Amino acid sequence: MANNHSALRLKGIILAIVGACLWGLGGTVSDFLFKYKNINVDWYVTARLVVSGVFLLIMYKMMQPKRSIFSVFQDRRMLGKLLIFSILGMLVVQYAYMASINTGNAAIATLLQYIAPVYIIIWFVIRGVAKLTLFDVLAIIMTLLGTFLLLTNGSFSNLVVNPASLFWGILAGVALAFYTIYPSDLLNRFGSILIVGWAMLISGVAMNLRHPIWHIDITKWDISIILFLIFGIIGGTALAFYFFIDSLQYISAKETTLFGTVDPVVAVIASSLWLHVAFKPFQIVGIILIMILILLLSLKRQPEALDE
């Protein structure tokens, strides 16, 4: 019995780590596709959301054959919340994250997005839901200092990061904070895979208004582009989320969140080694501060969260 429990726990740990690694690599692969293969970011977000949404809904039906994937549509209030979550949560966080990568790089975009828990702390304090603690103050200070060093390399006179990437990265973090807080009752009632699957598909349909998925020139695609697209759209999005959620069957939510901190580490390492993104000395200090902050925040009890 003990050996069986240990084996299941190990399975959960592996699933959580693999899911986080896929997320981190997915961002770096997206960076590669934008900069070296001229993939349009608008089309990519559309394809990523539509394909991943359909994939997750199919997975849900396979796992729950007796349940309807349309159950959320039977309650008008829940449907309204799903639509809000799909547009203000899923669509904004996915587009802003990819836009930050496109105008900067995957490492900085991922780090800026992962500051989201600090925005949640500030929001809860402003609303009076929680009192400001010493931990919260230290987290805010570490965020400001780490972000300042990452973006300026310690200089008060200039940015070493594209301002557009900074804007989109901060927006991605704010959207992720909303994405984390808002859908709790949806998740409790219908489950993560169904809600995220529909949110991706609905936001993907909305993105088609900006850039239809069929408006793409594939004549210059080679096998490498196709393989990277499959990884970025399926592996780095749908499979990453599925593995992460599946790990919750075997380990606690706190442990899963802790192992999820591998994501920004992988993004930074992959960007440095594969795409040769160079970081200056004080930027490296800022990266270390933000990673320590992410680790500490993962150990602190947070609202039930989803990921990008």
Question: Where do the model's predicted regions map?
Answer:
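Glycine-/small-residue-enriched transmembrane alpha-helix faces in small-molecule transporters
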Residues: 1-47, 158-185, 205, 307-308
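C-terminal-most transmembrane helix of multi-pass membrane proteins
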Residues: 2-5, 49, 153, 225-227, ...
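Hydrophobic alpha-helical transmembrane segments of multi-pass integral membrane proteins
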Residues: 10-15, 42-62, 84, 139-145, ...
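Helix-helix packing/entry segments at the starts of transmembrane helices
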Residues: 20, 47, 90, 94, ...
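Hydrophobic/aromatic residues within transmembrane alpha-helices
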Residues: 33, 44, 48, 100, ...
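C-terminal transmembrane-helix exit sites in multi-pass transporters
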Residues: 55, 116-141, 265-285
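Hydrophobic transmembrane alpha-helices of multi-pass small-molecule transport proteins
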Residues: 56, 60, 132-153, 207, ...
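Specific transmembrane alpha-helical segments of multi-pass solute transporters/efflux pumps
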Residues: 64-107, 149, 233-251
